[in-house]
């Protein structure tokens, strides 16, 4: 098949542009980091203009590397950091405030207030989500309540809101399209995932005008065309999905029971549950995996806030490594007789605990503990947290989906030590694919299949190829002892207000 597809992968710390050819092979990649802003404890912001400039720069870099004119690009697929919230002026396109990032915890008091009022069951029943600062809805409410004149302007229809995909679509199309897809909408705390519509009751509770929100489309749909002046050609935007759902698609997890986990800044495990919307009883998230041709496929998701960010802490915080890639080799040199546990609750704990007030802690230190032991504890914490997610998934699903095989992607997959540790702690095979750019690949497939130049779902799934399988090697008694120590460490970290 001929033609090129451009995937825009807008992440938490950087933006990437990946160009694929008609055979679904990567031709060129552009990447650019952008600043993070921490105006107060627990607050994390991005300047939307930084995001926009980084996206444009990476696309131009990828086109230059590929030696392609923009007119050779058949379609664009967009994938993005989810939940990050931005509100902008409808007339000028200027944001009224920095974007509030998914990691930001400033709306914890509002979430606590809503919980105290007994409203969490209503939000969960309608959205599949929990009342946590993680999600976009309370961020939108905070912006309307704390930016001078914002609520009045929103009610007059002068403002627009969205997650990062929506903001990029608006900018790319020159303000002609205010839209999102079902996966991003499902992460806002405002979208009824059973009815596939914005929920009037929830909007009323958070006092968010319906007109502020974007139109919700299928993941493979027409999201407008780019302004010619941006890249030199008008390019259709034909695919959009939140980053974890895009990775689920890129990993070809199309059948119920298939499971992937992405290891980037955080860790996100997604289990395809098919047309069945499973209501979690173990504080996982019920969400939309994707919506194609008007048909919704659901998923259970477990979200961990700190995964690769723990390695960044080793590098930037306590400076025991110079580069993230050094962490695995350093951990391999650790003293295995020491059992150190790092509970990386730097911004609270995500699933299945959902404790916004928990903070990080290290247990088991001795005088002989050093950089190698810290590195091992940081990497093992990723495996332990993933184990907690999979236990919760099994409790929700029973034996419906059979034996676990975990497909993995993200930057941490490059560490063989970490992936072997993951297989050992999970007592399950861990599969790494040949194409590691699974998030970009998922967005590209949405656009390419919609454009008619990439294969259908079944054929695409057959193209998934295994690079390496990590089989569990740890003795069962050792695994049990390690997990018991982890459970004890977590219990000591949780606050009195934690739900479990």
From Swiss-Prot:
Pathway: Polyol metabolism; glycerol degradation via glycerol kinase pathway; sn-glycerol 3-phosphate from glycerol: step 1/1. Inhibited by fructose 1,6-bisphosphate (FBP). One of its GO terms (biological process) is glycerol metabolic process. ADP binds at residues 12, 16, 265, 308, 411. It holds the Pfam family FGGY_N. It catalyses: glycerol + ATP = sn-glycerol 3-phosphate + ADP + H(+). Sn-glycerol 3-phosphate binds at residues 12, 82-83, 134, 243. Glycerol binds at residues 82-83, 134, 243-244. It is an enzyme of class 2 (transferase). Keywords: ATP-binding, Glycerol metabolism, Kinase, Nucleotide-binding, Transferase. The keyword ATP-binding applies. GO terms for molecular function: ATP binding; glycerol kinase activity. ATP binds at residues 12-14, 265, 308, 312, 411. Its EC number is 2.7.1.30. One of its GO terms (cellular component) is cytosol. HAMAP family: Glycerol_kin. Key enzyme in the regulation of glycerol uptake and metabolism. Catalyzes the phosphorylation of glycerol to yield sn-glycerol 3-phosphate. NCBIfam families: glycerol_kin, PRK00047.1. PANTHER family: GLYCEROL KINASE, SUGAR KINASE. This is Glycerol kinase. It comes from Chelativorans sp. (strain BNC1). The lineage of its organism: Bacteria, Pseudomonadati, Pseudomonadota, Alphaproteobacteria, Hyphomicrobiales.
